[in-house]
Amino acid sequence: KKSDLHTLQTGVVKQDSPIAVIGAGTGLGEGFLIPQGNKYQIFPSEGGHSDFAPRNQLEIELLKYLQHKFQVQHISVERVVSGQGIVSIYQFLRDRKFTTESSEIGEKIRRWEQESEKTIDPASIISQAAFKKSDRLCEQTMKIFVEAYGAEAGNLAIKLLPYGGIYIAGGIAAKILPMMQDGLFIKALKDKGRVGSLLDEIPIHIVLNPQVGLVGSVLYGLQLQN
């Protein structure tokens, strides 16, 4: 339904074109759909575990920070574009002292870091503070997150050319809708150099319905019955 979506770019739907789905939440899911008659064949992927590709000096520093933090060379894009990624970006900015940490937010994050059984949702705390524009560190955290999210959605789009649409799902996008709307996401998505213009006509939607997975399961079950 139209009420289940928020459109970031109307684009021009081309029949018989793929549809791409990407969704950040606990992790980062990616998949695509290919039309087959009056149905779609669904293909999952593990695209969230592909390499995080930094696009500027700050993101290069973030990559190095995560390599040191996790003691690995390979840093997946999921390490950045996910709920845990939001926290890691915050910790990176805090530890590198890119801007001052507020005592209120800092206390909550440190309490979460010390908990063995996690009772705090730090990503929610950070995103809410950024949404209220009450904390510079949280605002910068979410700026990096949204840009990285957009860049990865653009990577998926360049590979598939999904003129059937890109659907941004997962548990985060709908909750930070104003940040997804302010232009940073789309700008990063379409920043693909010489081929960036290929993305101008791709429809881009944010999925607002948190039960979309359940709805899809029901529809698939009905298709099997028929």
Regions found by a protein language model. Give the residues of each.
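Phosphate-binding/catalytic loop of phosphoryl-transfer enzymes
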Residues: 1-94, 217-220, 224-225
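ATP-binding/phosphotransfer module of carbohydrate and carboxylate kinases, centering on a glycine-rich
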Residues: 61-226
